[in-house]
Structures are given as structure tokens and as C-alpha cells.
């Protein structure tokens, strides 16, 4: 114990002893004055000074610009949620997860890979809509032809049309949310507020994704039931049927070109 205490005291003295550091300079022999090679007029790179201050606006234009900047930053922060809920990503990600579970695959493909596949399929499906937003909203705003408010309205139109197009054949969810908001029955797309359209679109996408998932599960459930009955008839009760049925599911999925059929039907469902 005393030995450990002495070691701690020794290292503590080393840490707290002041160390004098001498700069390297060239001193002629026999003199105490020296010359350094550094240029006295040369300044080292400095970190720029950034000042965040609150001041009173001089004109109404300053107030409007501050509000616009705040709205723009808010939209950037919620952009991932908008991508998830207002595009085809929601349906694609849910269906791909259903496929993974129906094939009894636990780790392959990973969730990050499925999300990446859903993301790029979303870009492929939404590319015409994004092109309209770029041509009608972003490009004129960047060139100074329109303001932020008009750019927002122009960007909103293609997204509203895409969401309404998916529910045009079955507008039940739109009517439900309109009734919950105590609004009259809409006759056209212009009569539906954006917040109601987004809520109805989310519910519609969840419904469609689960319907597709049920149809995907049916053939694989039949394989599980056949394998389980065969194992029970052979007396192999302790053997998990999932381990035996998974290779047969993969063989069936590969033989019918499952990925090609799945992606093709998903793409057609958005047309």
C-alpha cells in the first residue's frame, strides 16, 4: 500500500512540475542576443471571427427575410420525414420488409440495404415529379424570377398531384379526414387542403402496403404448413420447420424471378 502511494506521489510531482520551454533560435557564440528566421510581418492563419447578434430590423423586408430563412431551415430539418411520408418510400419499405419476413430471413438483406433499395426505387418512381419541381420552382427561384413563397406553391403542385393520383380510384381516406375536419365533400383536388391530403395519403399507403404484404405471405405460409405437417408425420417434432422450409422458399422465389416481378408490380402500382 505504501509502495503504491509513493508511486502516485512521484507521478503527481512529475505532472505538476513546471517545464520551461525554450524556442530554437540561432545565437552566436559568446552573445546572449539572437536572430530568428521568422518574418515579423508575417501573421499566422487566424480563425475568422463570427458574430451572432440580435438587432432591430430597419425595414419590413428584413423581417420578411428572417421569417423566410426560419421557414427554410425548418423545411430542411423535416425533409427526411417528408421524403418518408409524401413519396413512394413508405409503401416500398414496408413491402420489402414483408418480403424479408415471409422468406424467414433474419439478417439478409440487412435493414440498411432494404432502405437503400427503397430509396433508389423512390428516386426512380418520383423522378418525373422531382423534375417538375426543379423546373417550375427551384430553377426560377435560383435565377431570381420568383420568390420563396411562389416557389413553395409551384413545388407543392406536383407533390399534391402525385398523392391525389394514388387515391383517385379510392378516395375513401380523403373523405374520412375531410369529415373529421368538418369540411364539405371535395369535388376536385383544389378543394382538399394539403394537410388532409398528406394524412389521407399516409393512411392509403399503409393500407396498400399491408394488402401487398398479405398476398406475398400466402404462398410462403403454404410452404411452411406443408413442411410442418411432413415433419410431424415423420416424428421430427423438435426440428424447427422454418429451418427446413427456408431453402424451399428461396428456391421458389429465385425460380419465378421474385425480385423482378416484385419491383415491376410495385412500379406499376404507382402508375
UniProtKB/Swiss-Prot annotation:
GO biological processes: bacterial-type flagellum organization; protein secretion
Pfam families named among the record's database cross-references: FliP
Keyword Transmembrane helix part of the UniProt annotation: yes
Principal localisation: membrane
Subcellular location: Cell membrane; Bacterial flagellum basal body
Alphabetic keyword roster: Bacterial flagellum, Bacterial flagellum biogenesis, Bacterial flagellum protein export, Cell membrane, Membrane, Protein transport, Transmembrane, Transmembrane helix, Transport
Recorded topology in the membrane: Multi-pass membrane protein
One Gene Ontology CC term in the entry: plasma membrane
Transmembrane segments: 5-25, 70-90, 113-133, 190-210, 212-232, 244-264
Function: Plays a role in the flagellum-specific transport system.
Family: Belongs to the FliP/MopC/SpaP family.
NCBIfam families: fliP (TIGR01103), PRK12797.1 (NF009438)
Record-given protein name: Flagellar biosynthetic protein FliP
Originating species: Treponema denticola (strain ATCC 35405 / DSM 14222 / CIP 103919 / JCM 8153 / KCTC 15104)
